[in-house]
Regions:
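Adenine nucleotide-associated cytosolic modules
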Residues: 1-318
């Protein structure tokens, strides 16, 4: 917007050190009336150029190293959520969020690390057994983690990603705001029924041979679930139930899981999780995203509640 020299000097005063009520007096000394002050502020607000400095003050409670580490994330949030005070509020909300990741393979451990790196304060990883060499990935477990308990190795990976996050014990207290189901292999939709019955939002992520999938994001009772997706896949591919059984059989041999595809799935799943935690709807809500290792394509596929599932039936419906 075009401004006169006096108005330009007034804009210089909007540096976060003055309360809103003090601005008319400051503007009067520059020869600018209160009506024009209101017009300027409305124009700035309309183009998302104003922020609320008071909303940033709670961030001062974070360790200086953590504030510096999260500065790029805060800057990105200010572009995605440009309202006054919206970005710091979203970052602080992430700090209080609880996420449980089920699975510490190439996808799951990386999802947990990325969420912690993005400011999620309470990230817990659940998996059984010990780390195998093929579980290692740049964003998750390390090659020298082989032989360690998966939960211990995943906890260390999360701590490396965010050294100044809250104590891990806080992650185990209370129900999670989101569960990410990312086992080593294909997620079994039947295991997700307990999450549906408990009313816990959850997001599926995994790799099957040369295809990675993110979704659906399940909001129990209001969006299609993993069983809906399994029914849909079985309709499209009659061999799907057999493939699912093979991947969920606990076989000892490593399954196909390209490192770059796993990293892409993990980063996409983490992004979808953050979009949900930040209060918006990611593409995996009411659908899922397939990612091809063969040609690098990403395709969102819509998903409706399946009539053979019943997860979205209303009480009393027949």
């Amino acid at each position: 917007m075009a401004t006169a020299p006096d108005e330009a000097r007034f804009l210089d005063l909007l540096d976060g050190t003055r309360e809103l009520a003090a601005l008319p007096g400051e503007a009067a000394r520059l020869g600018i009336g209160p009506e024009r002050v209101g017009e300027l502020l409305e124009e700035l607000l309309a183009c998302n150029a104003l922020d609320d400095s008071a909303a940033h003050r709670p961030l001062l409670a974070l360790p200086p190293e953590e504030r510096a580490r999260l500065a790029p994330d805060l800057a990105a949030l200010s572009l995605a959520r440009p309202g006054p005070g919206a970005a710091p509020a979203a970052l602080l909300a992430r700090r209080e969020a609880r996420v449980e990741v089920r699975g510490a393979g190439r996808v799951g451990a990386a999802v947990a690390s990325l969420l912690a790196a993005a400011g999620v304060g309470r990230v817990r990883v659940r998996d059984a057994g010990r780390v195998r060499p093929e579980d290692a990935s740049p964003a998750g477990l390390r090659p020298d983690d082989a032989g360690r308990l998966r939960t211990d190795a995943a906890k260390a990976a999360v701590r490396r990603a965010a050294p100044w996050r809250p104590d891990e014990t806080a992650a185990a207290q209370g129900l999670p705001d989101l569960v990410v189901v990312a086992p080593r292999g294909l997620p079994d939709p039947e295991h997700g029924q307990a999450l549906v019955q408990a009313g816990l939002p959850h997001l599926y992520a995994g790799v099957v041979e040369t295809t990675g999938s993110v979704g659906p994001l399940v909001l129990p009772g209001s969006s299609p679930c993993g069983r809906c997706l399994s029914c849909r896949r079985a309709e499209e591919d009659p061999s799907w139930p057999l493939l699912l059984a093979q991947h969920c059989s606990g076989r000892a041999a490593p399954g196909a899981c390209d490192a770059t595809l796993a990293a892409t799935v993990a980063s996409t799943a983490a992004l979808h999780a953050l979009i949900y935690l930040d209060g918006a709807a990611p593409p995996s809500l009411g659908g899922w995203v397939d990612i091809s290792m063969v040609d690098g394509s990403m395709r969102r596929r819509p998903l409706d509640p399946h009539p053979d599932c019943g997860c979205c039936w209303q009480p009393g419906a027949q």
